[in-house]
């Protein structure tokens, strides 16, 4: 075991080109900048982040302060400026840290705007604070000179990218997806597309797209790492992401982030190899390529090495545990929502719901209803009405809104009917439980009812 550790440490300390990290940094910064500009240009900062009077929060994240609206707008400007600095490699660690803090703060304000690519940007932003992303093609490298990077840095970013595809692929191995759902509900809406539109409404199209998507996610990382299949695999990847964006524009910048970020799975010096093949720079053979690594890297202090290794292992373990944590909960996590977010469950769910809250005054047992539509924005209400934890939070807010003149805590129960992937609507929550008295629990919520139908057979 000690010998294996030593060999792994030696391989991770080996100097490699920092060009693939530079491409990833430039792409990440560009997409981060474009995302911030898009949020501001479309008015989403006001409507989704600064505008709502009440926010629905991620579990255990209620301690994150909700700043005034003007501060939220300022944070998005900071995100844009920090992303631009990351893109050009200007004090990249400070810029990445600023981006990560501002972006994560904004992301944690509102659970109903959760997107997988926001979570991916949070993780990559944190990684870029510590990885040597500006060793090449950056303002920093112009000031201090270009340098190579440890191979471990490249592999850590590779893991970051690979985990998205691998866990997204594993998540697709369920009965609904392999039977063409929810794609079978979405694709007919694109029947207006030329040439292929008439085919999209068929069950065969939904099955082919579902099985093809699962196969792609489960295998593309291996094919990108293998030189013999790399070019074909990347062409397939580009085609897959562009096609997905054309069919479902709501996925936003995710394809434009993953297409360039996936190139980190190529050889670390792939940009130079491409330029050499195009005749845009003289060939430099690997055995004669001069080393530009900072002096003394080979004599890294043992204590520092152990700290770095432990931190990397914990970081990787966290990102393996989060997508798999739903296994610790009973029932179907797509229905209960427990362990769903931060797990790369990409395009797996079509939920529609309706919820009405029954409020009871314990003093005289008088009861009335409130659908909470005046408390939350349409976007918040739509997501909340299908999510048990957010319904619980809404019940607490409904109690506050209706209990201003009451001397006793009001009881709030929910009639929540939800449809999952085309199933008949069914009760999501026990209608007899007073949600206003229910705290958040780390474990399973006992008042969430099981999915009424058995999962569709594989």
Describe each PLM feature range.
Residues 1-458:
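Alpha-helical membrane-anchoring segments
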């Amino acid at each position: 075991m000690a010998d294996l550790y030593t060999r792994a440490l030696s391989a991770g300390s080996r100097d490699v080109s920092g060009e693939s990290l530079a491409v990833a940094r430039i792409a990440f910064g560009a997409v981060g900048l474009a995302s911030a500009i898009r949020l501001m240009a479309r008015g989403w900062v006001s409507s989704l982040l600064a505008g709502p009077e009440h926010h629905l929060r991620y579990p255990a994240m209620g301690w994150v302060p909700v700043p005034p609206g003007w501060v939220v707008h300022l944070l998005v400007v900071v995100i844009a400026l920090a992303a631009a600095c990351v893109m050009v490699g200007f004090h990249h660690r400070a810029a990445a840290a600023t981006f990560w803090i501002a972006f994560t703060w904004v992301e944690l304000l509102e659970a109903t705007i959760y997107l997988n690519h926001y979570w991916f940007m949070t993780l990559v932003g944190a990684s870029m604070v510590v990885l040597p992303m500006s060793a090449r093609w950056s303002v920093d490298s112009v000031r201090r000179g270009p340098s190579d990077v440890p191979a471990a840095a490249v592999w850590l970013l590779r893991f970051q990218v690979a985990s998205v595809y691998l866990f997204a692929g594993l998540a697709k191995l369920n009965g609904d997806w392999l039977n063409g759902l929810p794609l079978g509900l979405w694709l007919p809406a694109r029947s207006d597309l030329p040439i292929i539109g008439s085919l999209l409404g068929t069950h065969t199209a939904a099955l082919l797209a579902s099985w093809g998507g699962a196969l792609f996610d489960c295998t593309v990382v291996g094919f990108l790492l293998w030189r013999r299949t790399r070019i074909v695999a990347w062409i397939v990847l580009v085609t897959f992401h562009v096609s997905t964006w054309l069919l479902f524009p709501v996925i936003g910048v995710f394809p434009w982030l993953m297409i360039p970020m996936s190139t980190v799975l190529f050889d670390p010096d792939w940009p130079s190899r491409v330029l050499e093949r195009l005749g845009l720079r003289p060939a430099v053979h690997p055995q004669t390529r001069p080393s530009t690594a900072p002096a003394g890297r080979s004599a890294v202090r043992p204590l520092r090495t152990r700290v770095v290794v432990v931190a990397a292992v914990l970081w990787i373990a966290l990102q393996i545990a989060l997508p798999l944590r739903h296994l610790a909960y009973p029932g179907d996590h797509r229905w209960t929502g427990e362990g769903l977010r931060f797990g790369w469950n990409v395009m797996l769910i079509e939920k529609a719901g309706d919820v009405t809250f029954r409020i009871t005054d314990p003093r005289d047992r008088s009861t009335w209803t409130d659908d909470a539509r005046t408390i939350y924005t349409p976007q918040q209400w739509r997501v909340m009405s299908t999510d048990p934890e957010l319904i619980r939070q809404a019940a607490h807010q409904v109690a506050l809104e209706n209990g201003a003149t009451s001397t006793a805590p009001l009881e709030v129960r929910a009639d929540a009917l939800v449809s999952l992937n085309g199933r008949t609507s069914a009760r999501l929550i026990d209608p007899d439980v007073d949600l206003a008295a229910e705290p958040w629990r780390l474990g399973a919520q006992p008042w969430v009812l099981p999915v009424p139908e058995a999962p569709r057979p594989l």
